[in-house]
């Protein structure tokens, strides 16, 4: 995303406890703030953001694999998580290999493509509420639906995600990822800046045809 704007201040925290302290401080001083991941699905006003942006960066991007479970911090690249799944012959995240953005943002909006979405694999999230307190959501507590989750409704920030995948064959997983990425290149102008999708694809058709 190359649609860049300025903010009064940007903070890249190094730990979850650091985020908690920052949020509590900003709340106590009534300072406007927003928390963002990679910014892949955001558009700012021309004048930028009048407040503090807390950005998930490299310190909060760790990815761990435990058998068929992947635990990823919210700042991790979704594409990197998909590649980590491939590396360990885990299937279920092929759809995510070409989706830009962070894991936290993807879970927040239940990102998906090609009949796959985050709600199909997420089993637990560690979140931060608007008062700087930790909240854990499990299973159906996420209330996932099309591009929606309880994380939006409750004004939560996703800090860490636990995903359950299935053991598969690496060559088949790679083949599926290659196929989906080829379809993206064929239909989407990936060489241009983008603020994300706008239209929902109707059953049996696709948004581009209707717009045309």
Features from the language model and the residues they span:
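Phosphate/pyrophosphate- and phosphate-bearing ligand-binding catalytic cores of soluble enzymes
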Residues: 42, 128-212
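Generic structural signal for well-ordered, non-membrane alpha-helical segments
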Residues: 19, 74, 78, 118, ...
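Short clusters of hydrophobic/aromatic residues that line enzyme substrate/ligand-binding pockets
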Residues: 1, 63, 93, 107-109, ...
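A generic local secondary-structure boundary/capping motif
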Residues: 41-42, 82-85, 93-97, 110-117, ...
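Hydrophobic, well-ordered secondary-structure segments
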Residues: 78, 82, 96, 100, ...
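Anion-binding (especially nucleotide phosphate/pyrophosphate-binding) glycine-rich loop
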Residues: 3-103
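Structural signature of FAD isoalloxazine-binding scaffolds in flavoprotein oxidoreductases
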Residues: 11-16, 43-61, 108-138, 153-160
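Conserved beta-strand segments that form the floor/walls of ligand-binding pockets within enzyme
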Residues: 2, 71-73, 94, 108, ...
